[in-house]
Amino acid sequence: GARGYDPGSTNRHAGGNGGDSSISGPGITAIGGGGGATEHSENNPEPAGSGGSGGGASGSRSNSNGSVHGTGTPGQGHDGGTSGSHWYMGGGGGAGAVGGSGNSSGHGGDGLEDDILGTSYWWAGGGGSNTHHPAYYNGDKIRGGKGGGGAGAPCHSGHGGVSIPGPDANGITTAGAPTSQTSQWNWHSGGSGGKHTGGGGGGGDYHGNGITHGRGGLGGSGIVAIKF
């Protein structure tokens, strides 16, 4: 799906849902994951998408719970995380676990481990969320889920320094890293999902900056493996 971005309060774009993949003979369809929500406290918010796994809920600028998270599909993935009480977003759902709640940790949900290729890898981890305060970012609180999930973007340095989690390396490829922390409050983009992992992209800055900065990460491409 398309990356989410925020060029202004009247023209927000949530992350797009991933595309479905199918095998026509046995009639098997893997449903694409749901995109993450935009911020919802001002004009024209867009909610999280539902799919194979659900997108994470947005945070609220006021001291109240945020928007509804996306839901996953039983047998394929899990729900996105719920948002917290103040600027804290939920992580994207993974194939093996729900996304983290913004009240405590908006990390991406972990995927599933499988050795169909002869080596054990994790697949389809959810993307981590962004947050507006370092207390809810440091360590693995905004990490991408195991299976190529991209980590969420850091907050600006005016709120304090953060320890950016390393890109997830449990998949067949390593997820992309989010933008390094700067003093800009609308600059940071989330890390992209790992190629061929089916991992979700991490959330971008709470306040976006057009179509170039402050964007959600790209979702990782998937893979079809048939063993016989």
Label each region the model flagged:
Residues 1-228:
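Low-complexity, glycine/proline-biased repetitive segments and flexible coils/loops
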